[in-house]
């Protein structure tokens, strides 16, 4: 039985599903904000007025197919890997520009490790690393049928070793769309973002729609999009390669 949210989720900017009303969901809706939120076990976090403080807690509380709404100006720094394992989880960010939910890592771990099939990330900002030399893929997708929509991946002087977004070998039906940005901002040709999007092996049914690779002044240390294995059925439309951004596919 669908749950009817007559007035929507209550947002005014951000992911499209945060703005419409009424809206129907098949699972619970959880709210997250580092501004006044408090982490606690379920059922905490089901009220916009009393959100959880972290996405990590929301992932723990949620079940497969639930929705997590991250409120405007949320920030979260992670020193351990956050595994997103609940199949069909929908993660929606409110806000625009730098006010959208922002995540950064403080250790050499995957910031997000997406292992649940059908997970959707929308309108989330991934900041540059807090220190140089991290080798782990910043965001790693290793499950099928995921969607990355309207997200922003920043790479800078501390990001010369690992990609902003990586796709594990064998992943199928990944869609990246909705004005998703990969941006490099370095200080020299050798101190700049490593890669925006990395395909770590083979991929099947990869769709890129309205994706922007921005190399800034010094471009990318490797390639804006690098594919290490064969891609079966790549569909790309309105992909912009700007300022030294290039693509290499096996």
What are these regions (language model features)?
Residues 5-8, 52-53, 61, 92-93, ...:
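Beta-strand-rich, repetitive solenoid scaffolds
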Residues 92-94, 117-128, 144-156, 170-187, ...:
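Right-handed parallel beta-helix
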Residues 23-27, 60-64, 84-85, 113-115, ...:
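Flexible, charged surface loops at secondary-structure boundaries
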Residues 1, 26-28, 85-91, 173, ...:
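Interface-prone segments of viral and bacterial extracellular assemblies
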Residues 77, 88-139, 155-157, 184-186:
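Right-handed parallel beta-helix/beta-spiral solenoid domain characteristic of secreted/periplasmic
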Residues 1-57, 240:
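Right-handed parallel beta-helix/beta-solenoid
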Residues 80-84, 107-115, 132-142, 159-170, ...:
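Glycine-rich beta-solenoid repeat tracts in large extracellular/virion proteins
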Residues 30-36, 53-77, 89-96:
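Glycine-rich repeat segments that build the extracellular carbohydrate-interaction surface of secreted
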């Amino acid at each position: 039985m669908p749950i009817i949210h007559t007035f929507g989720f209550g947002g005014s900017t951000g992911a499209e599903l945060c703005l419409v009303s009424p809206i129907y969901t098949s699972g619970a809706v959880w709210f997250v904000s580092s501004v006044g939120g408090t982490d606690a076990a379920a059922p905490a976090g089901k009220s916009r007025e009393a959100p959880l403080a972290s996405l990590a807690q929301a992932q723990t509380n949620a079940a497969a197919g639930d929705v997590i709404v991250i409120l405007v100006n949320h920030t979260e720094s992670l020193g351990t890997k956050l595994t997103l394992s609940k199949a069909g989880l929908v993660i929606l960010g409110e806000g625009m520009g730098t006010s959208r939910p922002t995540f950064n890592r403080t250790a050499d771990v995957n910031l997000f490790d997406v292992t649940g099939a059908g997970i959707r990330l929308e309108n989330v900002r991934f900041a540059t690393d807090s220190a140089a030399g991290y080798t782990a893929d910043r965001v790693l997708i290793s499950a099928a049928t995921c969607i990355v929509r309207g997200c922003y991946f920043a790479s800078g002087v501390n990001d010369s070793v690992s990609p902003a977004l990586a796709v594990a070998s064998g992943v199928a039906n990944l869609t990246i769309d909705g004005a998703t940005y990969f941006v490099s901002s370095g200080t020299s040709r050798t101190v700049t973002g490593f890669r925006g999007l990395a395909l770590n092996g083979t991929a099947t049914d990869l769709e890129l729609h309205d994706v922007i690779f921005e190399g800034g002044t010094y471009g990318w240390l490797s390639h804006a999009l690098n594919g290490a294995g064969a891609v079966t059925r790549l569909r790309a439309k309105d992909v912009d390669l700007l300022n030294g951004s290039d693509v290499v596919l096996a």
